[in-house]
From Swiss-Prot:
Lineage of source species: Eukaryota, Fungi, Dikarya, Ascomycota, Pezizomycotina
Primary location: nucleus
Protein name: U3 small nucleolar RNA-associated protein 25
Compositional bias segments (type: Basic residues): 18-27
GO molecular function: rRNA binding; U3 snoRNA binding
Biased composition (Acidic residues): 60-71, 113-137
Subcellular location: Nucleus, Nucleolus
Gene Ontology biological process terms from the UniProt entry: maturation of SSU-rRNA from tricistronic rRNA transcript (SSU-rRNA, 5.8S rRNA, LSU-rRNA)
TM regions (residue ranges): none
Pfam families membership: Utp25_C, UTP25_NTPase-like
Assembly description: Component of the ribosomal small subunit (SSU) processome composed of at least 40 protein subunits and snoRNA U3.
Amino acid sequence: MAAPRGKGSRSSNSRGTRGARGKRQRGGRPAFETSRVEKINDDGLSGSDAEAESPPIDELSSDSDDYDADGEEKKIEKPYNTLLQLFNTSQDTNGPARKRRKVDHNSKKTEIQVEEQDELHDEADLSEPEITDDDEIEDPADVAAEEVEAGDSGDENDNSSSLSLNIKAISSKGWLSHKSELPGRFRLMFSHPDTGGDTVQLPAPIHGLQSLKLKQKLALHAGDHITKFDSLASGLAPSIFGYHDLLFGARTLSNSARFRDLYCLHVLNHILKTRDRVLKNNSRSQKVPDQDLELRDQGFTRPKVLIILPTRQACVRVMESITKLYHAEQQENKTKFYDTFSAADDKSWENKPDDFRELFGGNDDDMFRLGLKFTRKTIKYFSHFYNSDMILASPLGLRMVMDKEDSKKQDFDFLSSIEVAIVDQADALLMQNWEHVEYVFSHLNLQPKESHGCDFSRVRNWYLDGQAKYVRQTLVFSSFITPEINALFSSQMQNTAGKLKITPTYAGAILDLPLPVPVKQTFSRFDSTSPVNDPENRFKYFTNAVLSPLVRSSAGGRGNPSASGTLIFIPSYLDFVRVRNYLATSSQTENLSFGAISEYTSVRDVARARTHFFSGRHSALLYTERTHHFRRYQIRGVKRVIMYGVPENPVFWAEIVGFLGLDPAGAAEAAEGGVRALFSKWDALKMERIVGTKRLGNMLIEKGGDTFTFV
């Protein structure tokens, strides 16, 4: 198993020591525009020094009473609270009275401008009734249309005996897997619970949205933005809308927007189906109040969808997909959202790679969370979590509100009824702190600590029985798959409907190098008995077989030209610390001068290390993968590359090896120095992306030697 990334601390800056470029409030702290899951303690709290705490139970509405005929939440006003509110209003002389929003019923598109207020006081009174244009008598034609749509309840497993059999098989790890090839050099593995029955078949590919059961509100406009499917989308769309789990390990710049639109359409459709079912059952119960109807149509809390993203700008892209598919007449707090989540790209990044600009362009702050509430005519940003249909957040943003030192203040009940969980750009989350992702998933679909006003007579049986995780759909999109992501696939994707894993067939990063001359690329395999022992075995091999020749070449002194220009690339920060300390203290390396750059190195020290390396004052330079991920430096003066381990991201291979050609005059000499990379059998996933799928097998099992050279 790969070594932990980073220091394992709770906090993580968006771009190493640089921090986020997004807009911040006064005082230098990130703007914390977020849904509140905790009650606000007004005693002596103000501004950014205040922490939000859990709201009282009576302020939280259950799903069964959340909606009226318009899809709005019902507002129950208590006479005493109303009287107290009027009294407080009459006594307030500190400022003008709040203006009522004028409603224009003829407007097709209305953006509600909200006043920027202190975030604690802005959402302090959660029970304050909202004034919206949905508070009017509906057109009877609209009501009839919604009644037709409400009959489509979606895909559910209401057969308790079948569900029990599937859960029993999953609990005993009884999965039956089938592998196949997909068009476009993709590989598919479909796994479903092995209950001893007939083999489960995947749904047939589709060629457009007309084959999907979409709510009328979405079907009217979705075709304008999602046109004809390619072969990959045709095969995966039925599984996404069929509530299968999916691990998609082939996310690229070219297909990311297409799949983002697909999963946004899916979750919107799911939210509308859930809402219409509740509305329909509310109507049924009101028509026959004397009958004891079994209307189980919801979970413990309202939030049904969780989307985990790496940055605020990624959240903006998801919201752009949502708003173009869900035509709302009003978008409350839209301006506030774009002011605090979006930013312009850095013009100095024009020469940065495309994948870097996609991830870090705009607002790259990785500490955020956002609640979204949908009604028939409105999208409300920054809604309270327990009043939200969807939550968009970064792993760090969620953990900061879930994991409190005081156990009484911990709150993750809002994740108890998540039915669709999505992780986009999982490879970027690996470079932040993957432990936060694991923490969030370990708290999904747990039994809530409080009732939060829940009507338990309407809660589905699998929630009451603690089986919700077996019905939850999980979608994970990543540019590549790592052991950590595979562990998430194995341990957290437990859907009784089955799960898919999509991986591409790799040609190999060694074939696509940005160099004018061929470069010798050597891979040295070392023996490693287990993932636990792999770091120790790697270090011993490096110090004995790799470092010794490097030290001998440095014996001639600092001015020896053959000893300079060695870049040592180290993927893991823990390995970086170990190698750095060894080079600094070992008698073996007393004649080797070196510099070191990690994700925690200050800008000043980075500049000094690069200058000394380029001038030859330092013979070697240690350089970590996370540093390259966050900075994409162009290191000059490189004459040979030693890779302590191959990078997770195959794009980095070409970029690191490309350092050899940054000085055209010395390109031939650098090509002779070449690249040497260390690997073991536990690096199979990384090595497949570097050397290619066809070459990997022989390199892992070859008994005739442990060194492989490609030119």
